[in-house]
């Protein structure tokens, strides 16, 4: 990430930034980000729309929906650990600190917008409550319906459809409402103690075969590339541990 000084100088001088995470990226021609997920899932036994709750220890393994597993990689929300592992008394001392972890939600609004040449538009402004437009229609022509250009407009708060429609009238590129979704857990908010808490949780869980992975499991502000990198690193660790065990 650029420094504060670099941000100010680049904005004053209208200098393009080429090193930031969104300066260049690959995007699927069809299917969007779901295409990547489906591709990675090929050849794997994935059970969709299943709740992995009430995971219990049995015979030195973990019982998940009637099947026994040596290890569990938990990619959910760390605030739900107690629900997923109800018999782990070792977790109870952590519950007060886990409950204090802060987070932020987002209302995402699917819209039609005027054609433009942008991918992301960051637009903090006192005149409206949105902070950015993600021009998904410009990532691939297949994201659009004919000549209609689509975008996702984000608001950092929960909003009603009526509030959204009024806000869209104030936003550039003439957005037209199509649908919206409120996600309570979008961004983990870290403080000086959150990483210490997650480290201590890992030290407690990993000897028992439970591993935390992902944005809300590790309470880290992972972008997708960083999340995938963390998954690959954990996979290497687990493979090495398996070889050590023989």
Model-derived segments and spans:
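Active-site catalytic microenvironments for nucleophilic, acid-base chemistry
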Residues: 43, 80, 84, 237, ...
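Alpha-helix boundary/capping residues
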Residues: 11, 15, 88-89, 171, ...
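General beta-strand structural signal in soluble alpha/beta enzymes
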Residues: 48, 212-213
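Short alpha-helical patches at coil-to-helix transitions and adjacent helical residues
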Residues: 33, 37, 224, 228-232
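Hydrophobic, Leu/Ile/Phe/Ala-enriched alpha-helical segments that form helix-helix packing faces
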Residues: 40, 44, 164-172, 242
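Active-site/ligand-binding neighborhood in enzyme catalytic cores
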Residues: 1-63, 67-68, 75
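Internal hydrophobic alpha-helix adjacent to the cofactor/substrate pocket in enzyme cavities
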Residues: 228-246
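C-terminal segments that line or cap access tunnels to active or ligand-binding sites in enzymes
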Residues: 70-71, 80-211, 217-225, 229
């Amino acid at each position: 990430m650029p420094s504060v000084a670099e941000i100010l100088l680049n904005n004053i001088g209208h200098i393009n930034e080429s090193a930031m995470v969104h300066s260049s990226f690959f995007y699927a021609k069809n299917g969007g980000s779901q295409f990547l997920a489906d591709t990675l899932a090929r050849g794997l036994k994935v059970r969709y729309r299943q709740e992995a709750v009430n995971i219990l220890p049995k015979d030195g393994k973990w019982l998940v929906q009637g099947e026994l597993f040596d290890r569990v990689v938990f990619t959910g929300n760390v605030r739900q650990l107690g629900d997923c592992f109800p018999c782990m008394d070792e977790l109870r001392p952590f519950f007060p600190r886990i409950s204090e972890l802060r987070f932020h939600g987002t209302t995402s609004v699917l819209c039609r917008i005027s054609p433009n040449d942008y991918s992301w538009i960051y637009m903090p402004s006192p005149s409206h409550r949105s902070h950015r437009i993600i021009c998904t229609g410009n990532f691939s022509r297949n994201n659009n319906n004919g000549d209609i250009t689509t975008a996702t407009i984000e608001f950092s708060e929960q909003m009603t459809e009526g509030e959204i429609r009024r806000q869209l009238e104030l936003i550039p590129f003439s957005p037209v409402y199509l649908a919206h979704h409120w996600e309570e857990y979008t961004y983990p908010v870290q403080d000086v103690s959150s990483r210490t808490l997650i480290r201590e949780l890992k030290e407690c869980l990993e000897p028992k075969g439970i591993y935390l992975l992902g944005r809300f499991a590790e309470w880290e502000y992972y972008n997708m590339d960083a999340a995938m990198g963390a998954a690959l690193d954990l996979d290497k660790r687990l493979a090495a541990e398996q070889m050590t065990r023989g």
